[in-house]
């Protein structure tokens, strides 16, 4: 019985290894993108981002692929600080790090990842102060701090966003959000309102 299965197994392996050259090249490319940790090309990094982001958009979060992007985007930023795509890569690295944190069950590990995302956003705001999407760094830091239940830190980030970018749609929306959330009131004002009820 075993002797009859062995040739059949060999035949199946032979057919499965056969394929067009294009199929083999596509497989090699995908493997290279997923396994490589050396992204010298912005195109490779963009491709990796699109792969990870397309999964996020359909609700399939691949934290390993996202982490690969984060690691390579931050490394790329160190090697190519003057590349016009570098701030974009850092913004998306921060967002992915935040998404990874949100899917991390352990609170201490989740908070560590949140702080890594904040560090990426801080690095971006420091090195690229004229980046057009800079307001989103403050917004995402505020979101992170709210998720961590650090409301005073969240309020600080939101206020910085409103102060620095008051004429943007995001700045106006966050100003309204601050009013709705009650951030406009001091803790004494809130306590006074509670005691009046």
Language model segments and positions:
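C-terminal motif of bacterial Sec signal peptides marking the signal peptidase cleavage site
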Residues: 15-17
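Short coil/turn connectors between adjacent alpha-helices in alpha-solenoid helical repeat scaffolds
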Residues: 54-65, 99-114, 149-150
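Alpha-helical linker/edge segments of TPR/alpha-solenoid repeat scaffolds
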Residues: 96-105, 143, 147-153, 180-197
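Short solvent-exposed coil/turn linkers within tandem alpha-helical repeat scaffolds
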Residues: 76-86, 124-134, 162-175, 184
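Structural signature of alpha-solenoid helical repeat junctions
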Residues: 43-44, 65, 85, 92, ...
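Bacterial signal peptide processing site
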Residues: 19-22
């Amino acid at each position: 019985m075993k002797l009859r299965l062995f040739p059949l197994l060999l035949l199946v392996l032979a057919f499965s290894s056969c394929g067009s050259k294009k199929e083999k090249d596509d497989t090699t490319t995908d493997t290279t993108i997923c396994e490589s940790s050396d992204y010298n090309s912005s195109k490779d990094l963009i491709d990796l981002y699109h792969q990870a982001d397309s999964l996020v958009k359909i609700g399939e979060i691949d934290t390993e692929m996202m982490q690969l992007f984060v690691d390579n985007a931050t490394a790329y930023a160190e090697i190519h600080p003057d590349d016009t795509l570098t701030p974009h890569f850092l913004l998306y690295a921060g967002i992915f790090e935040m998404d990874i944190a949100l899917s991390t069950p352990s609170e201490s590990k989740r908070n560590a990842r949140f702080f890594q995302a904040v560090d990426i956003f801080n690095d971006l705001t420091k090195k690229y102060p004229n980046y057009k999407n800079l307001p989103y760094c403050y917004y995402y830091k505020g979101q992170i701090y709210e998720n961590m239940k650090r409301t005073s830190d969240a309020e600080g980030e939101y206020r910085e966003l409103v102060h620095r970018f008051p004429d943007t749609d995001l700045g106006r929306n966050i100003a309204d959000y601050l009013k709705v959330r009650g951030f406009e009131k001091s803790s004494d004002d809130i306590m006074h309102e509670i005691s009046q009820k």
